[in-house]
UniProtKB/Swiss-Prot annotation:
Subunit structure as annotated in this protein's UniProt entry: Homodimer.
GO BP term, example: biotin biosynthetic process
Enzyme class: transferase
Keyword Secreted: no
Its EC number(s): 2.8.1.6
UniProt pathway annotation: Cofactor biosynthesis; biotin biosynthesis; biotin from 7,8-diaminononanoate: step 2/2
Role played: Catalyzes the conversion of dethiobiotin (DTB) to biotin by the insertion of a sulfur atom into dethiobiotin via a radical-based mechanism.
Origin organism lineage: Bacteria, Bacillati, Cyanobacteriota, Cyanophyceae, Nostocales
Cofactor comment: Binds 1 [4Fe-4S] cluster. The cluster is coordinated with 3 cysteines and an exchangeable S-adenosyl-L-methionine. Binds 1 [2Fe-2S] cluster. The cluster is coordinated with 3 cysteines and 1 arginine.
PANTHER family in UniProt: BIOTIN SYNTHASE, BIOTIN SYNTHASE, MITOCHONDRIAL
Residues annotated to bind [4Fe-4S] cluster: C54, C58, C61
An example Gene Ontology molecular-function term: iron ion binding
InterPro entries reported for this sequence: Aldolase_TIM, BATS_dom, Biotin_synth/BioAB, Biotin_synthase, Elp3/MiaA/NifB-like_rSAM, rSAM
Identification of the protein by name: Biotin synthase
Length: 335
């Protein structure tokens, strides 16, 4: 069985990424089968509980108040609304709810208290709950843990070297500090990046090296594909080739074998065949929706019926929620 390492070198990762494609997919699929059931995919639902009006300048984001996009600032959703959305998602087979707020950081106010209540209620439904709320202090992480939060998402986005080209209002160290604050609790870490920002292969390798040398690895590694939003600085970026996406997923799977690798934002433009290659390369999670949207109008997302049809075609089942004590995947060899 392939062991888990935390000392990956840049040259090693680049060599893996540049392996002939079919051989790379084979190697990644072999690793995947040692740690995960290759016949199961976790289906997740992302709820934008606070949309738009973010003060940060992330070049890709429609929710930044600095850019003229179709997204307008909205108030925090009512708890009952969020819980009802989660309940409907659960009825379709969704096992993980991710709640996102367009905040720079979490503030200790009534809105945070409301989020804590949302976490409690959705956790009580037997679902995994993930939050992505911006920067987080150690004390706030503990409060989320006490509310029953399963995971906290804080992406690195890209390599440390390329990062300042994409965002200037939050440092790379800020992101790593938030991850460390989450690590002080029993909440699992969700952290990945975005393809298509204008980064080089070296930047992709650098981001993966940072993630793969965190000890422990993030339990969840989302691989996002840029959706070019009109009005943002990256609106004219070219599409990422499918084989770049597959290479990134396969490399992440080999470097972090026990982690969930999530085929996240940008999946709507991929065909069923292209998504099948991503699953073969080690992706074992997707985001689905009942309204063709992931974050309001910012990122299109396939609907439940479309995804169910695809999973049935590929012979893949929906994975149930994990239990707290199982937050790090155990090795499981499936025939």
């Amino acid at each position: 069985m392939v062991g888990i390492r935390y000392d990956w070198q840049e040259l090693e990762i680049r060599a893996i990424y540049n392996t002939p494609l079919l051989e790379l997919i084979y190697q990644a699929a072999s690793v995947h089968r040692q740690y995960h059931d290759p016949t199961k995919i976790q289906v997740c639902k992302l709820i934008s509980i606070k949309t738009g009006g973010c003060p940060e300048d992330c070049s890709y984001c429609a929710q930044s108040s600095r850019y003229k996009t179709e997204v307008k600032a909205e108030a925090l959703l009512e708890k009952e609304t969020v819980v009802n959305i989660a309940q409907k998602a659960k009825e379709t087979g969704v096992s993980r709810i991710c709640m996102g707020a367009a905040w720079r950081e979490v503030r200790d106010n009534s809105q945070f208290e409301e989020v804590l209540e949302m976490v409690k209620d959705i956790t009580a439904m037997g679902l995994e709950v993930c939050c992505t709320l911006g920067m987080l202090t150690a004390n706030q992480a503990r409060k989320l843990e006490e509310a029953g939060l399963y995971a906290y998402n804080h992406n690195l986005d890209t390599s440390q070297e390329y990062y300042s080209t994409i965002i200037t209002t939050r440092t790379y160290s800020d992101r790593l500090n938030t991850i460390e604050n989450v690590r002080q609790t029993n909440v699992t870490v969700c952290s990945g990046g975005i393809l298509g920002l204008g980064e080089t292969v070296d930047d992709r390798v650098g981001m993966l090296q940072t993630l793969a040398n965190l000890h422990p690895h993030p339990e969840s590694v989302p691989i996002n594909i840029l959706s070019q939003v009109p009005g943002t600085p990256l609106e004219n970026q070219p599409d990422v080739p499918i084989w770049d996406i597959v290479r990134m997923i396969a490399t992440a799977r080999i470097l972090m074998p026990a982690s969930d690798v999530r085929l996240s934002a940008g999946r709507a433009r991929l065909s069923q065949v292209e998504q099948a290659f991503c699953f073969m390369a080690g992706a074992n999670s997707i985001f689905s929706s009942d309204d063709n949207k992931m974050l309001t109008v910012t990122t299109p997302c396939p609907d439940y019926d479309t995804d169910r049809e695809m999973l049935n075609l590929l012979g893949l089942g929906m994975r149930p929620p994990s239990q707290r004590q199982e937050k790090v995947a155990s090795p499981a060899v499936v025939g």
